[in-house]
A protein has these predicted regions:
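Short acidic, glycine/tyrosine-flanked loop/strand segments centered on an H-E-D-like triad
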Residues: 30-56, 231-251
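Alpha-helical support elements that line or immediately flank enzyme active sites
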Residues: 59-81, 153, 157-161, 213-221, ...
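Glycine-rich, mobile lid/loop segments that gate access to catalytic sites or pores
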Residues: 45-151
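A short glycine/serine-rich beta->alpha loop
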Residues: 1-3, 49-61, 145-149, 202-206, ...
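Glycine-rich anion/phosphate-binding loop at the beta-strand->alpha-helix junction
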Residues: 129-240
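Internal helix-turn-beta structural module
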Residues: 226-291
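Glycine-rich, N-terminal phosphate-binding loop and its surrounding beta-alpha-beta segment
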Residues: 1-41
Length: 291
């Protein structure tokens, strides 16, 4: 579907070969269920499972999503839309400031003053054979107004579904949702002025439709479940056994998820951009703000 660097309008096909797999790392756990993994649910649902890393429950599944997201990002760039992902919390280390532009560190962390603390944390986790979770964020700049449907395909609902599809994600918040319980209605409402919105607690989406402000969301990824710390589980015969998962596993899978989240958000936005163009091309979708 690509010729001389341009799409042809035909389906685009891609194959990503995994040439660095080490399936033997999983041979000692092929008959036991890893705690907090999909092993037990896949086995119950299908009566069979791929124990070599979890099959489609593995984050390897997301490699093709990121590839497709690269195409979506190119479409959004032509529209002036940018999608920016970052990590704001890892374990008990929280960013004091959020800078989602020009992040250039191996943790995708938004506060570079915390990098030495993160290095110490990761060294300790590796030595201990343990893991921690993370909070990630995505900010979409210059999103046009009007994307999303009012009921069954709300933009925030589709974004939530896309993010929750990512492995190990356990919750998502749109806008300032985590703090809304502490605010009164007079504080939480995003008042409208002639120059724009006075705040963005809604995260750029109202009634399932983008309102022209930045779209912001955050989500939490659980600690890596495959760890070297010994734990309890059952084997295929239903007997209680100890488990210790060897192999190459991250102390925090959250740092791997930034490009995945950017890709998923980009794919949802492109879908809605094209749908909105088809449905509302004859409507002048303007906000009543002063230029």
């Amino acid at each position: 579907g690509v010729f001389e660097g341009k799409t042809l309008g035909t389906p685009i096909g891609m194959i990503i070969y995994n040439k660095d797999q080490q399936s033997k790392d999983y041979s000692n756990i092929k008959d036991v269920f890893r705690p907090n993994h999909a092993d037990i649910t896949y086995q119950a649902k299908y009566g069979f499972r791929d124990y070599r890393g979890g099959g489609r429950a593995s984050a390897r599944e997301t490699a093709n999503w990121v590839a497709a997201g690269a195409i979506a990002k190119k479409i959004l760039k032509k529209e002036g839309v940018s999608v920016n992902g970052f990590v704001s919390e890892i374990g008990n280390i929280k960013a004091d400031s959020i800078n989602y532009k020009d992040i250039n560190n191996k943790y995708f962390f938004s506060d570079e003053s915390k990098l030495s603390d993160l290095d110490l944390m990761f060294d300790g986790l590796i030595a201990e054979g343990n893991s921690v979770g993370a909070r990630l964020g995505v900010v979409v700049e210059n999103c046009p107004v009007g994307l999303g449907d009012p009921v069954f395909d709300k933009l925030d609902a589709n974004l939530a579904k896309a993010i929750m599809t990512i492995n190990a994600v356990k919750s998502i918040s749109i806008g300032n949702a985590d703090n809304l319980l502490d605010l009164k209605g007079s504080e939480a409402r995003d008042e409208i002025t002639s120059s724009g919105y006075s705040s963005n607690n809604s995260g750029g989406i109202l009634g399932g439709i983008s309102n022209g402000d930045n779209i912001s969301l955050s989500f939490i990824i659980k600690p890596t479940s495959s760890i070297k710390t010994k734990g309890k589980t059952l084997n295929a015969d239903g007997k209680e056994v100890d488990i210790e998962v060897n192999g190459r596993h991250d102390p925090c899978v959250g740092i791997r998820a930034v490009p995945i989240a950017e890709a998923m958000v980009s794919l949802v936005l492109v879908d809605h951009l094209l749908i909105n163009r088809a449905q509302c091309a004859s409507i002048d979708q303007k906000l009543p703000f002063s230029e």
